[in-house]
């Protein structure tokens, strides 16, 4: 078991040392949550945000940014002398995803629902200090209970809010938390304009601001919201990275903001300068080098090694596409080696309710190293979603946007806890990604290759034989349901598309992409029909011929590893879907296709015959006669040849002359009669076809002439001489 990573110390100091001090009821809630000290970002942000200052906060993921804006909003709400009236909004928090908005809402809800009502003062002791100054006047004289806090609870405005206006009118919230599109629709809808009053708005918070502003749709909605709100407000931007879009927004929407940048530095030996980093100090950030064909194998071994040897119990595995998450969830959950793992699928194409259920199932699972929980997901769970107990993050695919790397890795080692992150990199050029990240202040250390005995070794020189074994195991699973084969092909294609759109394309080059190797890792039955694969095979064959030519000329050639591929032996006509409905639809399609094929064959044969007849009809009479003459000449030559052969036999003394002459004469007579019958039949058939075609041509001509006469006036000349033909 590796040595424990020490928890990162909180350099922000005690909550009691804040100036101005926080309200006692807020401190009580913070203490009940187990936070004894502030993080640096909280110590730097809260005092300024409580005062009348706009804040732009840049800090590493997992540094406590949520409390850094939640506490100032509540403190300003608590210090307000005049209570907010029904329908008035005190603060709006905008988050890029539904999951992040839900978690922020849960934090606000925890604070506001924990207040002690003043009516219970005689029973609970002195609570005067716990209550805000306007507590007695902020509610009607009706008695209050613990179920009715001093402040209205916050309202969540996302796709999961079915009746937002009814909820707003029944609860009268002062704080709104939601996603950009839903908030913009809620506030700017005519009904929202009538019942939601923002003239007294105090604070606007943009969490994960770089992601909010990187999406054109999100940015448009954020700008609409900001234009609707009063200019005399506090605006706070929080993010782990600052982009040009964020800088532009700072100039447009903030007034003299204070910048708060929290950097982490590694401790060094005497004489060494500390290095700045953008990941938590308690994070063991690593990379593992393997062939693409070995990636799924290494993923499985990492899960087994970390859970068995290091007793890790909660994992997140990131893929580049939703299709890959869906496919690998179905495959990995059926592998016997991972039977003790509880797998959950989570990606952006799932309906909101299912996403919410999946996230809840994963976070609430009582995981242990004997029954670990694994979340297979895309970048929808890379930012903002707060997982407090993640032990290991594995990146099956490096993120398309390098800025996302620190957000993915930051799902572990949060709030001072230790954690580990591993990114799987292909052998070769992809190893340059380590230096690329180091320049971006994200240092990585090497995670050794894991062999079949879960031992750490060097990357093998040849393809791990277990990769082929795993390929056959996955294929056996796929062969149980044709739908899995469809999903495998879809995930393979989508993974390549994501690879081709990588921002670090000078490292992740499509020219170096090995389709055979990737197909082994995905367990495909056959390579999908992609133009890129066809081009790749041509280039591969041309390169092979070039190297062979150099070898034949005595030149030296650097041997490159070639990973061969062989399609599985599958009868695709009988390979069935497990779903009866889908299989019935497939069989119906096959039958329809067969009928169409036979109909098409008959139609093509008829078209060929018609073209031949038309071509012969278009021939001049002299050419037709000449063709018949040539045919007769060929037959006469054939008869003359046979006669010559017979005479030659007679000269050599072979055969009976009289009987042979009789046979030849009889055969010639029969051929002549048969030829005459064929010519008569042919002439009759041609005559019928000719008459039929002539009739069709005449009808077409008549229609054209009549339409021409009706449109342009020359109606008499249009068809008056048709009968003279």
Swiss-Prot record:
PROSITE patterns per UniProt: DEAD_ATP_HELICASE, HELICASE_ATP_BIND_1, HELICASE_CTER, Q_MOTIF
Biased composition (Gly residues): 709-725
Entry keyword annotation includes RNA-binding: yes
Region (Disordered) residue spans: 119-156, 591-725
Residues covered by the Helicase ATP-binding domain: 46-260
Function comment: ATP-binding RNA helicase involved in the biogenesis of 60S ribosomal subunits. Binds 90S pre-ribosomal particles and dissociates from pre-60S ribosomal particles after processing of 27SB pre-rRNA. Required for the normal formation of 18S rRNA through the processing of pre-rRNAs at sites A0, A1 and A2, and the normal formation of 25S and 5.8S rRNAs through the processing of pre-rRNAs at sites C1 and C2.
Name of the protein in question: ATP-dependent rRNA helicase SPB4
Organism: Cryptococcus neoformans var. neoformans serotype D (strain JEC21 / ATCC MYA-565)
Protein's gene: SPB4
């Amino acid at each position: 078991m590796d040595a424990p990573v020490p928890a990162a110390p909180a350099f922000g100091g005690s909550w009691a040392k804040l100036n101005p001090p926080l309200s006692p009821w807020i401190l009580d809630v913070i203490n009940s949550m187990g936070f004894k000290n502030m993080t640096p970002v909280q110590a730097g942000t809260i005092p300024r945000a409580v005062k009348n200052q706009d804040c732009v906060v840049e800090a590493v993921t997992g540094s406590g940014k949520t409390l850094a804006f939640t506490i100032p909003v509540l403190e300003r709400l608590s210090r307000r002398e005049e209570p907010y009236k029904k329908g008035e909004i005190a603060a709006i928090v905008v988050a890029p995803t539904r999951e992040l908005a839900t978690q922020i809402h849960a934090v606000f809800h925890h604070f506001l629902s924990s207040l002690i009502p003043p009516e219970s003062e005689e029973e609970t002791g002195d609570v005067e200090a716990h209550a805000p100054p306007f507590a007695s006047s902020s509610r009607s004289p009706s008695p209050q209970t613990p179920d009715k806090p001093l402040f209205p609870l916050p309202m969540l405005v996302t796709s999961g809010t079915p009746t937002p206006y009814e909820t707003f009118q029944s609860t009268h919230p002062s704080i709104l938390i939601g996603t950009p599109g839903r908030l913009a629709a809620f506030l700017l809808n005519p009904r929202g304009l009538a019942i939601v009053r923002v003239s007294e708005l105090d604070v606007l918070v943009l969490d994960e601001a770089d992601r909010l502003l990187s999406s054109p749709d999100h940015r448009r909605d954020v700008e609409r919201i900001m234009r609707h709100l009063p200019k005399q407000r506090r605006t706070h931007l929080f993010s782990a990275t600052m982009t040009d879009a964020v800088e532009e927004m700072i100039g447009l929407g903030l007034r003299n903001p204070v910048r708060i940048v929290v950097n982490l530095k590694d401790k060094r030996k005497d004489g060494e300068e500390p290095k700045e980093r953008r990941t938590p100090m308690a994070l063991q950030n690593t990379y593992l080098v393997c062939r693409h064909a070995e990636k799924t194998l290494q993923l499985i071994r990492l899960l087994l090694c970390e859970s068995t040897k290091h007793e890790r119990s909660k994992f997140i595995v990131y893929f580049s596409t939703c299709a890959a998450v869906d496919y690998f969830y179905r495959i990995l959950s059926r592998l016997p080696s991972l039977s003790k793992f509880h797998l959950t699928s989570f990606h952006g194409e799932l309906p909101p309710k299912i996403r919410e259920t999946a996230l809840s199932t994963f976070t609430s699972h009582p995981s242990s190293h004997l029954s670990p929980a694994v979340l297979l997901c895309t970048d929808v769970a890379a930012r903002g979603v707060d997982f407090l107990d993640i032990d290991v993050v594995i990146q099956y695919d490096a993120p398309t946007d390098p800025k996302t790397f620190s957000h993915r890795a930051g799902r572990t080692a949060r709030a001072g806890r230790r954690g580990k992150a591993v990114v799987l990199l292909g052998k070769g050029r992809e190893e340059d990604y380590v230096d690329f990240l180091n320049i971006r202040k994200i240092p990585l250390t090497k995670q050794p290759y894991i062999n079949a005995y879960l031992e750490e070794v060097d990357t093998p020189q040849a393809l791990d034989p277990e990769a082929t074994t795993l390929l056959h195991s996955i294929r056996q699973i796929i062969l149980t349901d044709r739908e899995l084969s469809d999903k495998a092909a879809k995930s393979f294609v989508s993974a390549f598309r994501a690879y081709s759109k990588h921002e670090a394309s000078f490292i992740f080059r499509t020219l170096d992409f090995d389709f055979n190797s990737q197909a082994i890792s995905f367990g495909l039955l056959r390579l999908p029909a992609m133009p890129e694969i066809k081009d790749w095979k041509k280039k591969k064959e041309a390169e092979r011929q070039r190297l062979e030519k150099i070898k034949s000329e005595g030149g030296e050639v650097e041997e490159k590893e070639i990973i061969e591929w062989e399609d599985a032996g599958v009868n695709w006509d009988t390979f069935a879907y497990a779903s009866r409905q889908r299989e019935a639809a497939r069989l119906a399609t096959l039958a329809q296709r067969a009928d169409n094929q036979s109909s098409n064959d008959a139609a093509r044969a008829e078209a060929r015959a018609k073209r031949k007849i038309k071509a012969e009809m278009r021939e001049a009479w002299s050419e037709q006669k000449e063709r018949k003459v040539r045919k007769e000449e060929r037959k006469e030559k054939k008869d003359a040849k046979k006669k010559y052969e017979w005479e030659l036999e007679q000269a050599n003394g072979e055969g009976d002359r009289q009987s042979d002459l009789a046979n030849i004469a009889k055969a010639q007579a029969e051929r002549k009669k048969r030829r005459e019958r064929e010519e008569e039949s042919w002439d009759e058939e041609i005559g019928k076809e000719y008459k039929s075609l002539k009739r069709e041509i005449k009808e077409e001509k008549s229609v054209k002439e009549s339409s021409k006469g009706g449109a342009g006036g020359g109606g008499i000349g249009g068809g008056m001489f048709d009968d003279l033909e």
